[in-house]
Amino acid sequence: MNPYVLTILLSSLGLGTILTFASSHWLLAWMGLEINTLAIIPIMAQQSHPRAIEATTKYFLTQATAAAMILFASTTNAWLVGEWEIHQLSHPLATTTVMLALALKLGLAPVHFWLPEVLQGLELTTGLILSTWQKLAPFALMIQVAPTINSSLLIAMGLLSTLVGGWGGLNQTQLRKILAYSSIAHLGWMVLILQYAPSLTLLSLFLYIIMTSSAFLTLKTNNSLTINTLATSWTKSPTLAALTALVLLSLGGLPPLSGFMPKWLILQELTKQGLPLSATLAAMTALLSLYFYLRLCYAMTLTIYPNTLTATAPWRLNFTLITLPLSIITILALGLLPLTPAVTTLLTL
């Protein structure tokens, strides 16, 4: 793609997200979401491949449906209540419709079916943008409307997302689909605690973005798209293979890695709020996700394929452009757990 065109599209992505962040009126927020969608579609379709075009079409249809639902809900609220402000969303029909629309934009269960299929048809870098940056604007709106939404609906969607995210990834061999189901599971954890501790939701979103970015970048550097290619990565770059395994375990939430922190704090907060059953179910579904991460690590580190290479394994990474950001983001994805006491102190301020 032409660098000037790419710069304009990426600037439009940033503009759309910032516009949604800064808006208090539903029409402005809707406009920001639409700018976001229209900016990423050419980036998704830059590969002239039928799979990429199919993924782009599916993404466009789902996002257009969600945008229409948001417009319908805000208009309904303005008609019945007389308010266009995001914080003044009060009618039950409008709040439920907006929640479903934002869930469709994010890929929350039970409206998650588009996300694995779309992510499977994209390059890893475009999939990274879709899995991280494109979640910010809908989440900003969801945090603002969360106090008016029925808490039972949020808990049900959160638990269903963690279950679907864990269950759906079990039988996958494509890494992009596994990361898509991982995204669904993490979003479920965020929605689960959204009404009780929004600061924990933001912390989880921040750590999710760091860990997912690290996972996508390591897979991009490894040039791995399936479990089979991931299993041969040890012979190509042992250091990167070890880092990839640690990042995947961090995504699974194993201590002492960074991914354990948000799960630990969310389970603690749910128990404090008198929801031990929800906390237990969430912890049980986390085991499903952990299983397929362990499966990937087993394929990478414990089953080294026979090879005929006589050359010494290259311990140094070849891609100098990606090495520095990859190093920084991987360190953050692995080593933030010791900061948990400081984080809990900040959350109570």
Curated annotation (Swiss-Prot):
The keyword Electron transport applies. GO terms for cellular component: mitochondrial inner membrane. It is a multi-pass membrane protein. It catalyses: a ubiquinone + NADH + 5 H(+)(in) = a ubiquinol + NAD(+) + 4 H(+)(out). The chain crosses the membrane at residues 3-23, 25-45, 66-86, 98-118, 149-171, 178-197, 202-219, 240-260, 274-294, 319-339. Core subunit of the mitochondrial membrane respiratory chain NADH dehydrogenase (Complex I) that is believed to belong to the minimal assembly required for catalysis. Complex I functions in the transfer of electrons from NADH to the respiratory chain. The immediate electron acceptor for the enzyme is believed to be ubiquinone. This is NADH-ubiquinone oxidoreductase chain 2. The gene is MT-ND2.
